[in-house]
């Protein structure tokens, strides 16, 4: 199968191969042809058309039999992809079996073909995304446990705050992955449904056979049968797009964190290295976060596409003019971008390179200031909150002004040494002893992940 991709220079970077195949032109055409073949089988099952007509129709429902370029030219005149495809399908069937041709597309409308074909593609896309999310969850769970007790500087407003652990940070990424997997599972039965309403949504052309055909068609395609056709009720697709937007944003957060940890000034965590990866055309020393860039790019691009899906919701009456058309490329583009981000997230997370020694050195860049809160909390129990806070604030200012370690300044303060022994001060200024519930958060995130897998 030849993939007619939109941008071969960049697709390998921004799109996973599996998703590119789902949404290539042949994939679109095959989805629509699968609808037509299933429609014939369903109508024969309920006695609406002869059983003998099914085989000629089904045999013609292979995307490889059609000239995609010619279909593309015809779409520009027809206004949608189903019209020229159904004409080509009928012509091909008639060349082999003139009697069977009359039963093609019976009772359906173009949007039935296109929407159901899209749902069949979305089912494949959903399976790919869910599998990658599950795999990413496994990787992050392992990494969170591996680094559960490794301290690094917590950063708020891009400045050192109090110590956290790398495992806790990774557990945060894991929690988002788990929630997004839960969202996909919840929307799946709403999303994977048949579109079948005929001209204006009533299936009047099929008379008393309408519901039996609809039920049989849904069964043939292994899709749910909705309470009614949804030609201009697009919330199902928009909900899917919105969840993909959440996934892109969550992956963007992961990419942003890693890229910041890779900065020269931090140099604590790195993407896996490989020959030719992350280099510069002019600077031999560079090690750029090329994987994180894809995650951040997707998180930047997808929200605008999701907004397009939301903007296309108020569709007119029983068939939309233009708003439906706005979805055609938008949802596939969202799927492509999320697939590429997931691909890179897996590569980055699996090969994460960690410099724990650098983390420890960075924790001490402020010479103990990141642990001022730890001292203040204990001192407050003995001197009162306001007194303790004011005293520590003055000591911190003095440490900065004099370029000294906070531990040394505290040792010079009689009011503090009267309350805290040298051993207590040493312990309070040890990052490993001020990690709070960091390990608990890791355990809870990992437990929730594996509970979802059970």
Question: PLM features: what roles do these ranges have?
Answer:
Residues 215-231:
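A short, charged helix-loop
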Residues 121, 168, 238-246, 374-382:
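Short, well-ordered beta-strand elements within core beta-sheets of diverse protein domains
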Residues 233-268, 276-335:
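A conserved active-site cap/scaffold subdomain adjacent to cofactor or substrate pockets
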Residues 51-54, 266-273, 343-362, 389, ...:
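A glycine-biased, small/acidic residue-tolerant capping/turn segment at secondary-structure junctions
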Residues 2-204, 209-214, 277-280, 290-296, ...:
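A helix-coil-helix interface module used to build multimeric assemblies
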Residues 301-385, 391:
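Long, amphipathic alpha-helical stalk/connector segments used for oligomerization, subunit docking
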Residues 145-167, 269-279, 285-286, 317-326, ...:
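Glycine-rich cofactor-pocket loops
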Residues 104, 224-229, 270, 307-318, ...:
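A glycine-rich, basic-preceded beta-loop-alpha segment at the flavin cofactor/substrate interface
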């Amino acid at each position: 199968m030849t993939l007619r991709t939109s941008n071969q220079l960049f697709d390998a970077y921004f799109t996973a191969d599996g998703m590119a195949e789902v949404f290539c032109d042949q994939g679109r055409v095959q989805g629509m042809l699968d609808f037509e073949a299933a429609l014939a089988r369903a109508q024969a099952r309920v006695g609406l058309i002869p059983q003998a007509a099914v085989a000629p129709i089904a045999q013609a429902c292979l995307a490889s039999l059609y000239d995609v370029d010619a279909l593309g030219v015809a779409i520009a005149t027809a206004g949608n992809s189903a019209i020229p495809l159904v004409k080509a399908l009928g012509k091909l069937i008639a060349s082999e079996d003139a009697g069977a041709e009359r039963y093609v597309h019976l009772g359906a409308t173009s949007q039935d073909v296109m929407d159901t074909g899209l749902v069949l593609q979305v089912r494949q896309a959903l399976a790919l995304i869910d599998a990658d999310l599950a795999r990413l969850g496994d990787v992050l769970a392992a990494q969170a446990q591996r680094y559960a007790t490794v301290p690094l500087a917590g950063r708020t407003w891009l400045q050192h705050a109090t110590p956290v652990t790398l495992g806790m940070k990774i557990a945060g990424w894991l929690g988002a992955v788990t929630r997004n997997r839960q969202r996909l599972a919840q929307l799946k039965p709403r999303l994977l449904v048949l579109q079948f309403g005929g001209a204006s949504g009533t299936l009047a052309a099929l008379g008393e056979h309408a519901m039996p055909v609809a039920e049989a068609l849904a069964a043939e395609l292994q899709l749910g049968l909705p309470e009614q056709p949804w030609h201009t009720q697009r919330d199902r697709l928009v909900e899917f797009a919105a969840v993909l937007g959440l996934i892109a944003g969550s992956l963007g957060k992961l990419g942003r964190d890693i890229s910041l940890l890779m900065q020269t000034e931090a140099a604590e965590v790195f993407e896996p290295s490989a020959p030719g990866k992350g280099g510069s055309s002019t600077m031999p020393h560079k090690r750029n976060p090329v994987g994180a860039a894809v995650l951040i790019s997707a998180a930047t691009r997808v929200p605008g596409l999701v907004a397009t899906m939301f903007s296309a919701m108020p569709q007119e009456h029983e068939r939309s003019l233009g708003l439906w058309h706005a979805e055609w490329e938008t949802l596939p583009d969202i799927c492509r971008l999320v697939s590429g981000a997931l691909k890179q997230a897996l590569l980055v997370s699996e090969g994460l390179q960690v410099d724990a020694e650098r983390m420890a050195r960075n924790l001490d860049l402020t010479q103990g200031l990141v642990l001022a809160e730890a001292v203040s909390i204990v001192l407050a129990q003995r001197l009162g909150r306001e007194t303790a806070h004011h005293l520590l604030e003055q000591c911190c200012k003095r440490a900065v002004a004099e370029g000294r370690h906070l531990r040394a300044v505290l040792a010079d303060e009689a009011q503090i040494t009267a309350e805290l022994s040298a051993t207590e001060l040493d312990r309070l200024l040890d990052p490993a002893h001020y990690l709070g519930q960091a390990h608990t958060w890791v355990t809870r995130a990992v437990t929730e992940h594996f509970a979802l897998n059970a």
